[in-house]
C-alpha cells in the first residue's frame, strides 16, 4: 500500500469524502484536515521540511488517507496564481514520494458558478463578473496587485496541475476522475472507487446526503445583502459596517433558510451564466479541456489493460436499497 492523497479540486465533492466516506474506511487511517494543512500548508516555501511534515502526519504513512482541497491552492486566490498549487505538489512528493494522488475535476463553467456561490456563502458581496474579472481593470503597478490575488480563471484549467503531478509522481500514480461521473451514481462510483484502491468500507452505513447545497435566487440576493454588514470571511469584498458576531449569525440564518426549501429551487449554471459569458469561458478552457479528455482516455486504456475496476452494476438485495457489486473489466 501507499498513502492516498486526495488533493481536490474545490467544488468536486471533497466535503462528502471528508465527512462521510474516508472516515468509514476500516483498513486505512484517515488524517484530519487540520493535520494535513499543518503538515503541508503552514510552512513557507523556503522553510518547508519534509521530515517535519512526516512527523506531523504520524507513523505508518503507507496506510494514510489525506483529503484536503486546499492542496490545490485557495479557491478565491487561484492558488496564489498557481504558485502555491505547484509548490504543494513538490512538498507532497518530498514527503510521500510513493503516494497515490487523487484528483477530481469538474466542468469549468459549472465549477466557476459553484465557486462564486461559495464565495457569497463565505461573505462575498460582488457579482459574478466582478468576481471573475475585477482585477483585470487594475494597472500593472496598482497597489492592489501587491495584496492577495483574487479569483483566477486558470485555477480551473486543471490539466496544467495534473500534468505537473504526472511529471512528479508518474502518471500511473495519479488518478483523475470527473465529478460529473461521481454525481451521476454516488453509490456505484463509491463501490468502484473503493475497489480500485482496496478500501474496506461498508457502503450501507454511509451518509449519501449532499453537502454545501446551492442557493436559490432569493437567498443569493439576501446573502449578498447580509454580507455588507461584516468584514468576514473573504478578502475581496465590500462592506458598509462590521457588526461583531454578525457573520456567524447570518451564516446560521442562511443555512436554515436554505435547508427549509421554501425559497425556490437551487440555482444551476445556466441560471447565472449568460450565453456571451458562457461562450467566452468555453473558448478560454477549450485547449485545456481537449488535453484533459486525452489524459482521461489514456487512463481508461491503462485501466482496461490492467483489469482495474472501471464500472459497477446494481443488484437487488431484498429491500428497497441497492447493494453495489463492482464490475471488473479484463
Per-range role (PLM):
Residues 1-330:
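Anion-recognition interface
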